[in-house]
Amino acid sequence: MNRIEERLAALKEEGKKAFITYTTAGLPDYDTTKKIMFAQEKAGIDIMEIGVPFSDPIADGPVIQDASFKAIQNGASLEGIFTMMGKVRKAGLNSPVVFMLYYNTVYHYGVENFVNKCIENGVDGLIIPDLPFEEQGEIKDVLAKNEKSPILIQLVSPVSKGRIPMLLENARGFVYCVSQMGVTGKGANFHSQIREYLTEVKKESKIPVMMGFGIRTAADVAPLEDIIDGAIVGSHFIKLLEANNYSEEAATDYVATFKKELNA
C-alpha cells in the first residue's frame, strides 16, 4: 500500500468520504505552493492533486489554463516541482500527493527518469488526462518495475459506457469520475444521467470512486453521496486562493469546512 491506498483504507474504516483538492504548482511561486500544501494538511485534506503546468492544457478550463500559463511565466518547471516536492517531504508533509500532468511532459523528460524522480521525491499518484487507456502500456511497464512507484489513476467519463469494466479491471488507488462533458471548472451542471453513470462505475469498481469537474461546495455532491466515495475540487479552489491572495488561512478554512460538510 502507498499513501493513497492507506488514506483511503482508513477513511473506509471510519465510514468517511475523501476530499481532494487541485493546486497548480509554482503559482505564484514554489514557496507559496508549499505553504498552501501544509495549510491543507493542517485542515485534514485527504489527498492533494498538484498540477504540473503545461503550455497546452487541453482537459482544463479557463481557470486552470490561466493558472498554468501564469506559473510557467513565473518559471515553474517539472524539475523545479520535483525539487519542491522533495522539500515538502523532508519538512514532514505526510499527505498523499498526486501529480496531474500531460503525457508530453512525461515523454520529453523520459518515462523511466520521470518515474524514478517521482519515487525519489514522494509522489504517490499520477493523473494523465491525455493518455488513452490503450496507450498506457509503456508507463505501466515502467511503474510496475518498482513497488514504490506512484499509482496511475484511471479516469472515466460519461462516454466511457461499455468500456468501464475494461478501464477498471486493474485500476488502483481511486477512480476519477469526470462528472460532465468538456473541460474542468464549468460549475455543478452535472450530466443528466450522472446517477446512472456513477452507479455503473461504482458497481464495477473494487476501489473508491471520486467525482470531479465543476464542484464548488459539499452541497454540490450531496445528492450523490450514497454512491460516491469522495469529491475533487479544482477550478474553484484555484479561484478561492487567488481571490484571497494565496492565504494559508483561506485554504485551511475551505478544506476544513468542505470536509466537515461532506461527512455531516
From Swiss-Prot:
Pathway linked to the protein: Amino-acid biosynthesis; L-tryptophan biosynthesis; L-tryptophan from chorismate: step 5/5
Keyword Lyase included in the entry's annotation: yes
Tree of life domain: Bacteria
Listed CDD domains: Tryptophan_synthase_alpha (cd04724)
Active-site residues annotated for this sequence: E49 (proton acceptor), D60 (proton acceptor)
UniProt keyword list: Amino-acid biosynthesis, Aromatic amino acid biosynthesis, Lyase, Tryptophan biosynthesis
One of the record's GO cellular component terms: cytosol
GO function terms (MF aspect): tryptophan synthase activity
Enzyme Commission code(s) on record: 4.2.1.20
UniProt cross-references to Pfam families, sorted A to Z: Trp_syntA
Catalytic activity: (1S,2R)-1-C-(indol-3-yl)glycerol 3-phosphate + L-serine = D-glyceraldehyde 3-phosphate + L-tryptophan + H2O
The keyword rRNA processing is assigned to this record: no
Protein family (similarity comment): Belongs to the TrpA family.
Subunit structure: Tetramer of two alpha and two beta chains.
Function: The alpha subunit is responsible for the aldol cleavage of indoleglycerol phosphate to indole and glyceraldehyde 3-phosphate.
Protein name stated in the entry: Tryptophan synthase alpha chain
Taxonomic lineage: Bacteria, Bacillati, Bacillota, Clostridia, Lachnospirales
Gene: trpA
